[in-house]
């Protein structure tokens, strides 16, 4: 990632968690799980009892969050309105509990040049908490074109 100067949200979230650890925070990430879309991994931190996040995204609104959220559900919901696929469907459905990357210290996650897919695999295996009821999911409307265009300013196609 550092050599290529390009990162996915997973790599960006892990990198941000490492940076947060270096300045004294626990290296925490959490997974925002989507349907008909890719998940989003963000580094999270707590200041004076409130959660914030550091994230890498090609979408404008899926990045940094100030530490003003009282709980993880509230933080996850801050991504809901602007979490959509290219068909304009709101896709965010679940979030995980925080994962402290210190659990992977014996695998040298911060310094290895080898792939660290074990972190992504762990995120896929842990429970996630639903954000919406089935009735809510059924009644979601698509984003309007202006919102989609605004959120995709600077979007980098793969």
Regions found by a protein language model. Name each.
Residues 1-158:
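A structural boundary/capping signal
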């Amino acid at each position: 990632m550092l050599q290529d100067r390009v990162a996915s949200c997973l790599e960006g979230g892990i990198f941000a968690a490492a940076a947060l650890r270096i300045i004294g925070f626990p290296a925490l990430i959490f997974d925002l799980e989507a349907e008909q879309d890719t998940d989003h991994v963000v580094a999270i931190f707590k200041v004076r009892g409130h959660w914030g996040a550091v994230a890498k995204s090609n979408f404008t609104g899926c990045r940094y969050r100030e530490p003003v959220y009282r709980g993880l559900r509230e933080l996850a919901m801050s991504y809901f309105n602007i979490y959509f696929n290219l068909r304009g469907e709101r896709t965010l459905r679940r979030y995980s509990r925080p994962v402290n990357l210190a659990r992977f210290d014996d695998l040298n996650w911060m310094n290895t040049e080898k792939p660290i897919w074990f972190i992504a695999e762990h995120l896929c295996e842990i429970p996630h908490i639903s954000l919406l009821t089935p009735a809510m999911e059924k009644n979601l409307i698509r984003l309007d074109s202006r919102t989609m265009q605004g959120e995709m300013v600077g979007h980098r196609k793969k």
